[in-house]
Amino acid sequence: MQLLPLLAAVAAQATTSQAVQAAPVPIIDMHFHAMGADALGPPGSKICAPYGPWPRRDPAKAIDEYVKRFTIAPDCARPLTGPPTDKALLRANVENIRRYNLIAVASGPSHHVEALYRTAPSQVIPALSFGDGPLPSIIELRQLHAKGLLKVLGELTFQYAGIAPDDPRIEPYYALAEELDLPVAIHIGPGPPGISYFGGPGYRMRHSDPLALEEMLMRHPKLRIYVMHAGWPMGDAMIALMYAHPQVYVDTGVIDYAFPRAEFHAYLKRLVDAGFGDRIMFGSDQMVWPDAVAAALEGIESAEFLTAAQKRDILYNNAARFLRLGKDGKAETQ
């Protein structure tokens, strides 16, 4: 009679072991968004994965014609479509987190971030995106941090407001991040092409120079910071900054799926060949198109110049080190 419980226990253990073996290895997505389905226009907008060639604009025609070809009805082999409702987008985000065993640094409006965090608390690192709209007060940020709802400061989107990364208006946020040991995620580089004409009139590409961070880094030597989009297309400046400031990391958000694959791989290889493969972190920049996660992962996995170990570093190890995560995926110091 005692044999039956023993067999049941062995069977349960075997099933658990098989489940663990079948589970995908964890991936850290340093550039994930939690937002409403209409955050980037009417629900159901599209993005190409990848574009190629980029849509061109005839300035004699209304900007709506360009926007249609860019994100409403783009002509590409693989258009990704956004879900119709906030609930559908949240559900798809949670499904992706579970399917790919993601630890997602999720930024966006605080209520959307909190909704995602409450749904998958063990796999979501809550962050706050701001910079091109009303700015949160330092008191508000301290309160979010005290509640455990602010563990990364960013995505800082000041570039969309025409504000350079070394602008004095950002200084209080850098100082707070250093004080609280909050990693900073800053947007430097590409927005949607042509965004200055239809969605972000303040955006200027000239504010994409990573070296603009240099004096700030000297004022805040203990600050953890990563440059989103790997500073594309400013490869020389990005390499120079990482060389001179060994604490600076980058993520691969959006350039790993929306950009022509040859361009992304050439840019990624440039950073790796320059000796910075251990400071490159995977980021999907999933906004309102959940399938962007799969497309972004393909961008890394298809890079034949990377070894399996280098891919694993980009997909997990580098970010785990930067975030100071323990073996269980939880923060060691926060």
Question: Language-model segments: what does each one mean?
Answer:
Residues 1-9:
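Sec-dependent signal peptide recognition
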Residues 25-75, 91-95, 276-281, 287-334:
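Mid-to-C-terminal alpha-helical segments outside catalytic/metal-binding sites
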Residues 31, 97, 153, 177, ...:
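Conserved, mostly hydrophobic/aromatic
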Residues 35-37, 111-114, 133-136, 159-161, ...:
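Active-site environment of divalent metal-dependent phosphoester hydrolases
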Residues 45, 49-86, 92-109, 124-129, ...:
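Divalent metal-dependent hydrolysis catalytic cores, especially in the metallo-beta-lactamase
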Residues 87-101, 105-119, 162-186:
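Aromatic-lined substrate-binding rim segments of carbohydrate-active enzymes
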Residues 88-93, 133-144:
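Short, acidic/polar
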Residues 118, 122-124, 151-152, 166-281, ...:
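Catalytic pocket-lining loop regions of alpha/beta-barrel enzymes
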